[in-house]
């Protein structure tokens, strides 16, 4: 487990699938994910099995509250490209349906994963695709971690009867 003061990151385990499914099915969360359909436990199991087969490019973690030892969220470095040393950053706090919060728990979990990506995996870039209406997450990563806007993908999401842009943000490893 990658440990901080309040939270830790451990690889996703099969017993996490129920709570991960429940969190991902929260409608306010789901609209911010690329997978917009309601997920079943069978869907989660297929995802988990695929994750096991692609461990060399997908590092997915359950965020654990170190005091209670209970899962509070999920985070990952996904689709790692080992040639250009980049990874897609995935993150949410499911506990209390926070999604993301400008609190020490969210900040510590993100910092742990960024540090792991840069210091242990020797990544050069960590990036995210976020929908333009997800201002909470966009502002969190830009303001708290100095992510920069890289690109705009026009009309890349359909939600609430209209098209929305995607914003690509990233953080470079400035060794």
Positions of predicted regions on the chain:
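Conserved active-site tyrosine of GNAT-family acetyltransferases
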Residues: 140-143, 169
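A short, well-structured alpha-helix characteristic of acyl/acetyltransferase catalytic modules
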Residues: 1-45, 175
